[in-house]
Swiss-Prot record:
3-hydroxy-L-kynurenine binds at residues 52, 110, 136, 148. Residues 1-19 form the signal peptide. The keyword Ribonucleoprotein does not apply. SMART domains: KU (SM00131). This is Protein AMBP. The record marks 296-297 as: Inhibitory (P1) (trypsin). The precursor is proteolytically processed into separately functioning proteins.
């Protein structure tokens, strides 16, 4: 389960494509006696199929990703965190999905496009695999449907792969639109893939830029250093993609999310909160209160407790924190300085 957020990015792309979507879809039945609590935890997204023709444009770039499902901030939500490689960078996406009166059916609404996605858990044994179907309806293109296969481990039995294929075919997804993705390993948000210099140079020399408006063009940063861009307001850019990115808000001294269109924009644009904070925060963050935030991810991080004059560990909920948040004790001590314990005061501003 790469999650409804990632499904949404795929399905809404159909709004801009002239496709022949499935005119009718069979009624989707959820897993019998569905247990919400048993679907929580970590999953690997292993395969995808869709009636959306946009999938064929990116199939060679797709790989196995991870998804963590858990209780949401309210009783009516499910929290999702998806981590994947994208364009050589490890990207993390978070979101919240709405429960319905049907156990095993969830909704995700995107106000920008006025679209509501319906997602169904159609087959699962909870301990090994799960198959999701997600459908979208638009006035211009009718219905589209996407199938996703998830596993508790990066590999599944051949019989389960065939079961997924059968489910996808039965809802009108063509065989050449079913993709079993390669496993490139797990990643940490903000990490970049290591690429030999010769290959990187060759790619820059021979690969054309993608067409304007594709939603995948590089940022325009001019001559600014990345840290100099931290004082800029975020820029969505003119393209119509919907990539969740982070920007540094100097007023709140926190990294916050925004929807990046995929091209142009400016340098105050980061794949992960970690990358944003480590680039932009100032030493003033050490005097901020320690904020867990309203989400319930329970991530163990470090923060500087000004009252005690030392770095302490705390549980970060995963959203709406501030800059007083460090990813190791060493980073916290080096940044904020801890008198009397042998660490020098940090002079970076």
């Amino acid at each position: 389960m790469q999650g409804l957020r990632t499904l949404f990015l795929l399905l809404t792309a159909c709004l801009a494509s002239r496709a022949d979507p499935a005119s009718t879809l069979p009624d989707i039945q959820v897993q019998e006696n569905f247990s919400e609590s048993r679907i929580y935890g970590k999953w690997y997204n292993l395969a995808v199929g869709s009636t959306c023709p946009w999938l064929s444009r990116i199939k060679d770039k797709m790989s196995v990703s991870t998804l963590v499902l858990q209780e949401g901030a309210t009783e009516t939500e499910i929290s999702m965190t998806s981590t994947r490689w994208r364009r050589g960078v490890c990207e993390e996406i978070t979101g919240a999905y709405q429960k319905t009166d049907i156990d095993g059916k969830f909704l995700y609404h995107k106000s920008k496009w006025n679209i509501t996605l319906e997602s169904y858990v159609v087959h699962t044994n909870y301990d090994e695999y799960a198959i999701f179907l997600t459908k979208k309806s638009s006035h211009h293109h009718g219905l589209t449907i996407t199938a996703k296969l998830y596993g508790r481990e990066p590999q599944l039995r051949d019989s389960l792969l065939q079961e997924f294929k059968d489910v996808a075919l039965n809802v009108g997804i063509s065989e050449n639109s079913i993709i079993f993705m390669p496993d490139r390993g797990e990643c940490v948000p903000g990490d970049r893939e290591v690429e030999p210099t010769s290959i990187a140079r060759a790619r820059r020399a021979v690969l054309p830029q993608e067409s304007e408006g594709s939603g995948t063009e590089p940022l325009i940063t001019g001559t600014l250093k990345k840290e100099d861009s931290c004082q800029l307001n975020y820029s969505e850019g003119p393209c119509l993609g919907m990539q969740e990115r982070y920007y540094y808000n100097g007023a709140s001294m926190a990294c916050e999310t925004f929807q990046y269109g995929g091209c142009l924009g400016n340098g105050n644009n980061f794949i992960s909160e970690k990358d944003c904070l480590q680039t932009c925060r100032t030493i003033a963050a050490c005097n901020l209160p320690i904020v867990q935030g309203p989400c319930r991810a329970f991530i163990k991080l470090w923060a500087f407790d000004a009252a005690q004059g030392k770095c302490i560990q705390f549980h970060y909920g995963g959203c709406k924190g501030n800059g007083n948040k460090f990813y190791s004790e060493k980073e916290c001590k080096e940044y904020c300085g801890v008198p009397g314990d042998g660490y020098e005061e940090l002079i970076r501003s």
